[in-house]
């Protein structure tokens, strides 16, 4: 094996090239690779964090939806209860008004009845007076006329 000067020159040139590369080229490449690895790790961590946040947001939205449905159901039930109460109150008021009208009508009928009785009594008195004057005209017997008047009043 002949070692000549060309081979030694190539070895020296290669060593200089390796040294130059290690000193000037390799550190920026290594730094770029490290930055790239960090960015990828950050991206993966960010994606994992976003995935967890999405799950939390889904659970929260499901809980909010469940609460909203429960509240809506409660509002509907309360509205139904209030409507039922209003309906019952309206029925009670209508019944009370009907009873009041009925009572007023009965009182009015009773007043009309009393008035009619009074008119009948007045008519009776007038008829009795007419009968009495006829009896007096027919006979002067007081006992007989009194008896006739009493019978007449009793019949009426």
From Swiss-Prot:
Function: F(1)F(0) ATP synthase produces ATP from ADP in the presence of a proton or sodium gradient. F-type ATPases consist of two structural domains, F(1) containing the extramembraneous catalytic core and F(0) containing the membrane proton channel, linked together by a central stalk and a peripheral stalk. During catalysis, ATP synthesis in the catalytic domain of F(1) is coupled via a rotary mechanism of the central stalk subunits to proton translocation. Component of the F(0) channel, it forms part of the peripheral stalk, linking F(1) to F(0).
Assembly behavior: F-type ATPases have 2 components, F(1) - the catalytic core - and F(0) - the membrane proton channel. F(1) has five subunits: alpha(3), beta(3), gamma(1), delta(1), epsilon(1). F(0) has three main subunits: a(1), b(2) and c(10-14). The alpha and beta chains form an alternating ring which encloses part of the gamma chain. F(1) is attached to F(0) by a central stalk formed by the gamma and epsilon chains, while a peripheral stalk is formed by the delta and b chains.
Protein name: ATP synthase subunit b
Transmembrane segments: 5-27
Membrane topology field: Single-pass membrane protein
Pfam families: ATP-synt_B (PF00430)
Name of the gene: atpF
Similarity section: Belongs to the ATPase B chain family.
Species the sequence originates in: Francisella tularensis subsp. tularensis (strain WY96-3418)
Subcellular location: Cell inner membrane
InterPro entries registered for this protein in UniProt: ATP_synth_B-like_membr_sf, ATP_synth_b/b'su_bac/chlpt, ATP_synth_F0_bsu_bac, ATP_synthase_B_chain
């Amino acid at each position: 094996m002949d070692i000549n000067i060309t081979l030694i020159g190539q070895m020296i040139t290669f060593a200089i090239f390796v040294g130059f590369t290690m000193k000037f080229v390799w550190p920026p490449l290594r730094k770029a690779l490290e930055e790239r690895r960090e960015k990828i790790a950050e991206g993966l961590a960010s994606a994992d964090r976003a995935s967890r946040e999405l799950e939390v947001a889904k659970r929260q939205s499901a809980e909010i939806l469940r609460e909203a449905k429960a509240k809506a159901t409660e509002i509907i039930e309360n509205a139904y209860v209030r409507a039922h109460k209003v309906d019952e109150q309206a029925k009670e008021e209508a019944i009370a008004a009907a009873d009041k009208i009925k009572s007023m009508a009965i009182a009015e009928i009773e007043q009309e009845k009393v008035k009619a009785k009074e008119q009948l009594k007045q008519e009776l008195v007038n008829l009795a007076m007419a009968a009495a004057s006829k009896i007096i005209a027919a006979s002067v017997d007081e006992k007989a006329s009194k008896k006739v008047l009493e019978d007449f009043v009793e019949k009426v």
